[in-house]
């Protein structure tokens, strides 16, 4: 049998299985949009600085995503921002599946200026109104600040002409350096393509829609609800575990358990 992996950030397992000569990059965007610009700032007074950056975006009716290391920090930061007269909401795994799309819709509509979370962009969120992704404590090595996670997270600011990333860090870790180099490489490729083809980057216009599922459908999984093949799920779980993506592996494990209960 043959398998085709499709990923913006393939893990080591996929790369190993594919072999370098069989990996095809698809980096060019027809819209001409570039990868975001990147800035590194010290962690001292990072929250104070973040507040000023959020206010700048708010004046232009733009949104911000802020990434912390823990759920507790996400909630605490969101509460503090609210006290500072910034419309903020936190979002992490404890938010029910059917609540998440509602919060994201409200962010896009402007009810919130900023969304605070842990790994918001690992699920491929498409939020064209977001112009700033702020990663707090970016130099704390670990899964949430790995090269792959940083690339995925920074890519969340690539849906807007003014996309920008701020990494709050006192040192440049290996993961940070590799992620920054990769984003810059992709940005350079797009700039050259735009120049050769006389393309002027265009903003993404995306309609804000209501979540299509009714509230009674409480058992929908946000990522795997259409997958019926148990063996495929088990393979995905193993790949996630090998790539140290334990949160993803746990989600798939729970889904397999639910499907088994449904067969009993």
Residues covered by each model-derived region:
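Conserved RecA-like ASCE P-loop NTPase motor core of nucleic-acid helicases/translocases
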Residues: 62-70, 91
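C-terminal catalytic or substrate-handling cores of phosphate/nucleotide-
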Residues: 69, 74, 80, 84-87
């Amino acid at each position: 049998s043959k398998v085709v992996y499709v990923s913006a950030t393939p893990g080591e397992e996929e790369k190993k299985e594919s072999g370098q000569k069989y990996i095809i990059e698809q980096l060019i965007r027809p819209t001409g949009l570039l990868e975001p610009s990147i800035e590194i700032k010290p962690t001292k007074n990072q929250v104070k600085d973040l507040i000023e950056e959020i206010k700048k975006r708010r004046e232009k009716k733009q949104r911000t995503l802020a990434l912390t290391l823990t759920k507790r920090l996400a909630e605490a930061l969101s509460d503090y921002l609210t006290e500072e007269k910034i419309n903020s909401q936190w979002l992490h795994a404890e938010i029910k599946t059917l609540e998440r799309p509602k919060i994201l819709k409200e962010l896009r509509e402007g009810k919130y200026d900023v969304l605070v979370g842990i790994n918001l962009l690992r699920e491929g969120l498409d939020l064209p109104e977001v112009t700033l992704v702020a990663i707090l404590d970016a130099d704390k090595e670990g899964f949430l600040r790995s090269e792959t996670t940083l690339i995925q997270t920074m890519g969340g600011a690539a849906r807007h002409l003014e996309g920008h990333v701020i990494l709050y860090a006192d040192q440049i870790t290996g993961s940070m350096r590799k992620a920054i180099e990769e984003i810059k490489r992709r940005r350079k490729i797009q700039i050259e393509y735009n120049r050769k083809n006389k393309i002027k980057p265009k903003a993404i216009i995306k309609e804000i829609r209501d979540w299509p599922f009714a509230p009674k459908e409480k058992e929908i999984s946000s990522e795997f609800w259409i997958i019926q093949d148990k063996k495929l799920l088990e393979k995905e779980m193993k790949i996630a575990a090998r790539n140290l993506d334990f949160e993803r592996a746990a989600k798939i494990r729970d889904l397999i358990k639910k499907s088994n209960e449904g067969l009993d």
